[in-house]
Amino acid sequence: MEANHCSLGVYPSYPDLVIDVGEVTLGEENRKKLQKTQRDQERARVIRAACALLNSGGGVIQMEMANRDERPTEMGLDLEESLRKLIQYPYLQAFFETKQHGRCFYIFVKSWSGDPFLKDGSFNSRICSLSSSLYCRSGTSVLHMNSRQAFDFLKTKERQSKYNLINEGSPPSKIMKAVYQNISESNPAYEVFQTDTIEYGEILSFPESPSIEFKQFSTKHIQQYVENIIPEYISAFANTEGGYLFIGVDDKSRKVLGCAKEQVDPDSLKNVIARAISKLPIVHFCSSKPRVEYSTKIVEVFCGKELYGYLCVIKVKAFCCVVFSEAPKSWMVREKYIRPLTTEEWVEKMMDADPEFPPDFAEAFESQLSLSDSPSLCRPVYSKKGLEHKADLQQHLFPVPPGHLECTPESLWKELSLQHEGLKELIHKQMRPFSQGIVILSRSWAVDLNLQEKPGVICDALLIAQNSTPILYTILREQDAEGQDYCTRTAFTLKQKLVNMGGYTGKVCVRAKVLCLSPESSAEALEAAVSPMDYPASYSLAGTQHMEALLQSLVIVLLGFRSLLSDQLGCEVLNLLTAQQYEIFSRSLRKNRELFVHGLPGSGKTIMAMKIMEKIRNVFHCEAHRILYVCENQPLRNFISDRNICRAETRETFLREKFEHIQHIVIDEAQNFRTEDGDWYRKAKTITQREKDCPGVLWIFLDYFQTSHLGHSGLPPLSAQYPREELTRVVRNADEIAEYIQQEMQLIIENPPINIPHGYLAILSEAKWVPGVPGNTKIIKNFTLEQIVTYVADTCRCFFERGYSPKDVAVLVSTVTEVEQYQSKLLKAMRKKMVVQLSDACDMLGVHIVLDSVRRFSGLERSIVFGIHPRTADPAILPNILICLASRAKQHLYIFL
């Protein structure tokens, strides 16, 4: 138990990760008096805790001084040196600070990160490790790799594996194998390895070298000795160019001494060697995944004509990938315990890097948070080029006023002040000690952080002020025994997310304080401040620059969401909501149980729908199966269903079944709904209003410009669609595609179909198109079917050569019947150029090109879209269909007319 984890307490009074390592002897003189075993055990507990906190967002190590003296004392040189070795950095205070309160001693640990302030050439890997457990040969020595060397080594091995994969089966690789064989056989040690006998005292004709190591047998515990040296030496040879480990040769004189036959059994020794090598952890970047290749030779050592003993020679081949001596020594906090990282986890985190975008992607997105200078658990954050940077969003949403303190958002501040007498005075009283900063109000900071709302909370207020740590205030209607737990848990989550999601690299804690607005008097404060721990002064925000840096991390926490790019890139990437999207998202669900959201093509309606369902779950404490998402087509239904945030159904299924357990409904792409199967809007209203005392949420997202039929949609008249919000910031499409969409929208305005309300068309005048995103639109006319499929295949091949994959491409036709007509011809043309699969849009996560109809692809997107002969039964809605088609393409659009 001790070797794997220490107890971790997140106590009700601690809104931080606090690891209690028990009793530790402190002070240099006191530690010198300890037995070595006890000193090592205490040091190991502290170092494991420090490493785990560094890799988990920072926190506090708490210990009780084993020496009964309460006078101030230092840690001890061995502890300090071990902490310096852990961070591989000379200045302990960059990551650690200490405080003592009586017999309680605290080490405050800042999160690990590739901090930009390391200007002296120091290197911070993605995670902190006590040991990489990686070795290589360096001259005649075995070199233990530090973090920088381990990172470079892993990257080199990864590149070699990729190169070998690309050139697999080609003659050059066979030549390289032959070259290795010749080098191996030309090694002078090879002759000894081939012999069966050797004379005691013979001096070998070759010295130690990068490929040769001499070791003597120890006189006692021979098998244990061999088992102990194998991990370092065998892994070092395997990680370099291979080599020979001689056991039984004096390394100075090169004399063969062997081991007396009475002290060793050859077969047992071979078994020990095999067992030790089989335990070596290996990590592969290649597809073949072989084990470590080695051979063991036991050579008989004769003294004259008498058998004296044995010489052991282990021949190791260079390994294709990476061999460790043991699992790397690195820890993280998981499920309230310190857990060691597995070898595979360690390699994955060490090599964690910003994703490699295809060239066009890189031009279309701007980095908001890079892994190169962020804490270990962060994911990269990108925004579409032309959208607000996190600094702009911070200035818009949470500006730091010069020289005074402000409450924001102002509308919520006024509303709460009018609703709750004495609230303004209570908050003002708490703010008096602070001269500059911002108080960010929320009806529930817990909900904002994806936690459940607590009944009885009037509001939460986050104070970000100069010369203070951040403080989270929870204001209760009346005293509540669970109020402090709620506030502490919320503050804890906020601190963790500021670091591990928002990428804040400074020293930070969030104190928690509960206030009670009692009915008898104007205000009554519960003075139980968060933590008896007094954080060091460096945890306070020194000025405007520090406050703004923290608030920019807060922007990522509040506006960040899992990007749809994650599925395409194969790693988790975050995007940011626009300010307009966030303002709608932050509306009170209790006051906006029904809302119509009108959004232009590419304005993020489906993303908003997903975010709102997550918020519903936390505000109303409901399970995912009580939230229903309804759309028109099966592919979008499947896409949402795979997110596991709700129950998702099509309109037809919604009208056919009863849904007795559903409480909240979110409807997407409502402009394409129909009424031939029944009145879906009336049914949705009936379901969400079943509970008169607590009606459910009904939010409806739509865009009349993307209406794909001339029938009645079942939506209420435009004049009855209130309350209503609009999404007018178009964020999806490249410039040329956006221009094409605008042209088609203008045609609709000039001659609108009969089922599009004229009042809706004015939304176009409010549109804001994000400029500067590269891409192209190409309209191709009068191609034959053969020419079309050949053009698509050739163009796809060019895109794949540039780094795109089949999952970036969609080919859209007018009807499902046409899908069948095009499939065989398109597949035949594709397979002349490359091996590729086609599938419909119901499986959006597979590695294939999507071939489906424009209507069924509604609500989905791809970087590259080919539209083949888009047409409709009624020409009046052709511009709508073309908008539906074009708006699915993020960067490259090809339309065959």
From Swiss-Prot:
**Source taxon at top rank:** Eukaryota
- Enzyme group, top EC level? hydrolase
UniProt xrefs under InterPro entries: P-loop_NTPase (IPR027417), Poxin-SLFN/SLFN_N (IPR031450), Schlafen (IPR029684), Schlafen_AlbA_2_dom (IPR007421), Schlafen_AlbA_2_dom_sf (IPR038461), SLFN_3-like_DNA/RNA_helicase (IPR018647), SLFN_GTPase-like (IPR048729)
Q: Where is the segment annotated N'-domain region? A: 2-355
Please list the residues that make up the active site: 208, 213
How the protein is affected by changing residue 208 to A? Abolished endoribonuclease activity
Classify the main location: cytoplasm
Keywords, sorted A to Z: ATP-binding, Cytoplasm, Endonuclease, Hydrolase, Magnesium, Metal-binding, Nuclease, Nucleotide-binding, Zinc
| Annotated binding of ATP, by residue | 599-606
What cofactor does this one take? Mg(2+)
Please list the disulfide bridges: none
Co-factor remark: Can also use Mn(2+).
Q: Give the EC number(s) under which this enzyme is classified.
A: 3.1.-.-
Positions in coiled-coil regions = none
Q: Does the keyword Transmembrane helix apply?
A: no
- GO molecular function annotations of the record: ATP binding; RNA endonuclease activity; tRNA binding; zinc ion binding
Positions of Zn(2+) binding: 284, 286, 321
GO BP annotations listed: defense response to virus; rRNA catabolic process; tRNA decay
Localization, UniProt: Cytoplasm
- Name the GO cellular-component terms: cytoplasm
Q: Which family does it belong to?
A: Belongs to the Schlafen family. Subgroup III subfamily.
What PANTHER family does the record tag this protein with? SCHLAFEN (PTHR12155), SCHLAFEN FAMILY MEMBER 13 (PTHR12155:SF43)
Q: What does this protein do?
A: Endoribonuclease that cleaves tRNAs and rRNAs. Cleaves tRNAs 11 nucleotides from the 3'-terminus at the acceptor stem. Does not act on tRNA(Sec). Able to restrict HIV-1 virus replication; ability to inhibit HIV-1 replication is dependent on endoribonuclease activity.
Comment on protein domains:
Shows a pseudo-dimeric U-pillow-shaped architecture of the SLFN13 N'-domain that may clamp base-paired RNAs.
Q: What is this protein called?
A: Schlafen family member 13
Q: Can you name the source organism?
A: Homo sapiens
